[in-house]
Structures are given as C-alpha cells and as structure tokens.
Amino acid sequence: MNLKNFSSIVLLAFFCTQIFQLSVHGIDASSKLYIVYLGERKHSDPEVVTASHHEKLTPLFGSKEEAVSSIVYSYKHGFSGFAAMLNESQVHILSDMPDVISVIPNRKFAAHTTRSWDFLGLDYSSNSNSLLQKGKYGEDIIIGVIDSGNLVSNTSFHGLAAGSTRGGAPRARLAIYKACWGSGVWCSGAALLAAVDDAINDGVDIISMSIGGSDEFPGTLHAVAKGIPVVFSAGNEGPAPQSVKNNVPWVITVAASTIDRTFPTIITLGNSQRLAGQSIYYEIQHSNTNDFTTLVDGSSCDSTTLTEQNITGKIVLCYNPTAIPGVLPRYNFGYAAQNVLDAGGRGIIYAQYTTNILYPCRGGGPCALVDFDIANKINSYIYSTSNPLVKISPAYNIEGKQVLAPRVAAFSSRGPNPRFPGILKPDIAASGVSILAAVNGGYQFMSGTSMACPHVTGIVALLKSLHPDWSPASIKSAIMTTASDTDSYGVQIEAEGTPRKIADPFDYGGGHIDPNKAADPGLVYDIDPNDYTKFFNCTLGPSDDCDSYVGQLYQLNVPSITVPDVKDIVSVWRTVTNVGPINSTYKSFVQPPAGVSVFVEPDLLSFDNNNKVKTFKVTFVANRKVQGDYTFGSLTWSDSSNHSVRIPLAIRIVIQDYYADTA
C-alpha cells in the first residue's frame, strides 16, 4: 500500500495490538519479548523477509509452527528484524549469530505528552511571503505520527476547511500509527519499531514521534536513509543536565520554548494592594467575582496540612516544593489544587519559580499562578491582619512584544548528550508552552516537548514541499543554522530553571526555530546516510574497526561542533553545500568559547557552478590548563546576500582523562 495514491485529506492507519496467551511448547514462563535487529533487508519481497525470520527461529523452537507463534512483530519493509518471545538461552544463541546486529529486551517508553504559528512568523494571510505560502501549506506531504493514536472528535481535524483552528502545514496529510497504550501512555519498543517499519512501507514523507529513546529504534536510521526526516521530542525532565532523550544524530530533537502570549490576572488583597499573576480563570455567568474571599496560608498544601485547617470556601496560598531538584511544577500544582478542592477550598494561588505554564482551574473556582516574590507579598499580608481577604479577577490576554519571548521552558530536557558526548543535543527549540491543543469536546492549553515536536514537524513539511530534493540532514541543517539565539528584543534568550540563566546550546541546540529563514539557509551541512550507518555500527551495533572513530564522534558532519575533551589542540573538519546563489563567497566569523582560541581554514569559501561543496577545518586551542566544564561560542559563515549560517560550538577543556563536570 502506498499512501501517495490516496486522495483523502486525513488517513488514519491505526495499529491494533492483540492480547494473547502463549502456551505452546518452546515458549515457557521465563520467556520475554525481545527485539532482534538484523539491519538491511536481504530480500525485496517482505514475505520472503518474514520467512527468513521463521527460518532463523525454527532451530531454536524445534518446529516452524512454534517459531511462527513466538513472533509478535516481523519487521520486513524498511529493514529486517523481529520481536519475539524468547528465553535467555535463545537470546544468547541469537546474539552469537554473525548476521544479528543486536538483541535487546522490549522496553516501555513514555510519551512526551493558534498563536504559536504567528509567533514563529508563519503568517496565514494570502499576501504573505512566508514559508507557509512558499511551501504550499505542506500540500500532499504525508506526516506519519507515531503515538497513542487517539481519535479526537473535534472539528479542527476536519479536512475540508471546516476546522476552526489551523496548524503549521494545513494541507499536509496525516498517517496515524498507534504504538502506545494505557492511562500513562506508555509505548512498547517493539510496537514503535513496527510502526516505523510500516510508515516506511506506506510512503510517508516525515515521521514525528513525541516519545523518549530513539537510540532504541534502529528503524529511524533506515527511514532517514530513505529520505524521511524523523522528528523527536527532547523530553520533559529539565532543567537537570544530561536529561535530553533521543540523542542519535540522524533525528531532529526538539526542546520546548515559550511564546509571546500571556494571561495575566489581577489579585486584589483586602488592603487594596493589586498584584499580578497568571491564570486561565474566566468569569462564569452569574458568578459574583466582585466578592472578596477569606485567604489562608496552606504552605505546601498537602492533605494533612489542609485537613488541620478550616479552608471551606476559602482561597488558599500554596507553595511549590522547589527544594527538590528537577521537580516539574505542573505535577505539584495538580496535587495541591486537588487537595484544596477535596478539603472544601474555593480556589488556589500557587507559587512556583516559573509562571509560564497554564493550568485549568479545578472545580470552576478561581486560581492563579504567581512567582515567589509575589507569593511573599501575599504571605506577609496574610500575617499582618486578622481577616485576610483576596479577590482573583478573570484573566485577560496579552500578546506580542509586550511579552518577553521566547524562553526555554523549565521542564524541557537539557544537554549535554548523555549517550554521545561529541553530538550536540537538543538540536532546536520551538513553541511548546501553553499551546492551545484540540481535545475531545474542545480545546485545552497544554505544555511539553510533545507540543514543540509537532511545530518542527510542520515546518519540516513546509521545507520538504519547498525543497523536495533536500535530504533529511540538509533540512535539519537549514533549521539549526538559521535559528535565533535572541528574543523579540534582540536580547539573548533565557532558559527557565532554578535559577533562570542565559540559554546555551545545551538548552536549545542551534537556537529558537525561524521557519522563514530556514527556507533559504544559503549553505547546508549534508551527511551521507552511510556515515549515519557507520555511526550506528560503531556506537550501537557491531563495532569492528571503530576504536579511533568512537573517540572522535565530533567529526560527523552535523551543524554543530561539540568536543568534550580538548587537552591541547583538536582539529575538526566540516563540509558545506551551497544551496543559495550559484556564485557566492562566504566569510567566517567566530565567537570563541571562553578559554579557547579558534582558527578556521580557509576563512573564505567561494562557490560557483563547478564548486558547490567546500570543506574547512576548525582548530581549537586550549588557552587555560584547568579542568573545567563546557564553554560556548559560535562559527558563522556570512555572504553579501544576507545569509548567516551559524553553528554552535561547545568545548570542554580537560587536563586529565576524566570530566570534572557534566554541565
């Protein structure tokens, strides 16, 4: 089946799973589900590939029937492999076979579960010259979305202009693959690999996965080798360092950032002091929002504390326990709000270190988010009077340059890359905070890198429509090298956390995505798929003749340079391809990392019709003999046509064979 032959606007290709009992001889109680990866297919006929899987397992089970019964998934389209119920003895036998690349136990992976498109510069007006129009709104681009495959009954998904909201590539088509189940939305590695295999066979143009653990999915390597870009979310475990997921170089890993919209609400205290918070609290018809309500201090608002107080009908001030590193404030808000509601409280004022994430007000009562400075003022007022009162007014909307944006979200997972230190991750940041998303029966503000991932997927669809001959590596390069490292006021982007800081490449990769600049990057850092295969074989697969390669992963031609171990001098090579004006000359500009000298040879690159590809060398010299952490800089190639091709530099000086820091 080829999806290109379908005329429907939205295609749903749901995966279904079967729950079954395995009781045949050869599959004993100790058997577990394993993924056996065999690499490229040896046959073009999928049925022959599956037959080869049966043939491989038959000696292990004693009969073909039992071998067939053991297989849960046969990967036969984009690559070769299978998921089967195996015991430890069978696993050892398979692992020793020369044509078996890997045998890994099936794992569960967590799903990383409007105005944002205008903020990104994708103007929907007909006279706009943005990437949206240049890319024909993503027309006929098929996006394979691999996740929980939920059917959302909402007219926004109507394919015939009946929707009430728009996306980034509104004329693209969707192929939805179900690989995740359960209330917590956990995704089976075996099912995810099967979904990738089917997506390749179905002819999708892009694969989007808001799921953790891409290094466990070798199928994505085959997708990219076939010209299919793969977009992953970075994870929601920030701001802790080395928390980023999906760390292989062939995928686009997306961090989350804020947008230029906020919903302030006025909190009026009984002494007439007016303070600002954030909320999506709105006035319910016939409710008396002019009334003041008794205000109490609920501290962390655990159920025990609230039970000891009489909070019935009152508004409670609660604090997020920020003493716990890496705790996501959204979890604690829900916990506190539910406790307040259960104890009879009318509403909640919740204090945390960032107020950009919006939550629905539980029970229809008033709620507001405040930072700790505001909370301390409220707390001081509570203990200054015998009858503290408060009124939370309905929120209103502010958008545009009045709102400082973007900022990297506190929850967005951070680098450095925990698996491959010489590869920068995440790759890019995009809108992922308080995004209006369609749900059953309406809309809801949602936050997460799972919100940021679809933004980049939509932009990739537009780029693929505009430049159908570009490889996945070229598209990724265009996105990263044109990204912005400054906010709407030209000030360096900040990263939220404890404390807030100036963002660096470990927070946002190349920067915050700029779709319109990505349409015309000037130069791209392209990569031969064979180089990805070598990377896989030397890091995740068979490792023959890889000793020198593994120590220099930073030589892969990605649009960034990360060297974790500069002792004295390290030289790195990069190659760029001209996709701009045929006759052009680029000059290099370096912002060196602190404590490092950077030399570029040559510092001029000239292109013409016969010279479209150029290689250059970047040499890093350690100026200080101190065991340190990473410092950051950039290398930019600029021409006379306003092309500015910037890649981030992340360098760590070491004097011993160990690393003093990870951040």
What are these regions (language model features)?
Residues N2-A663:
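Loop-rich non-cytosolic ectodomains and luminal regions
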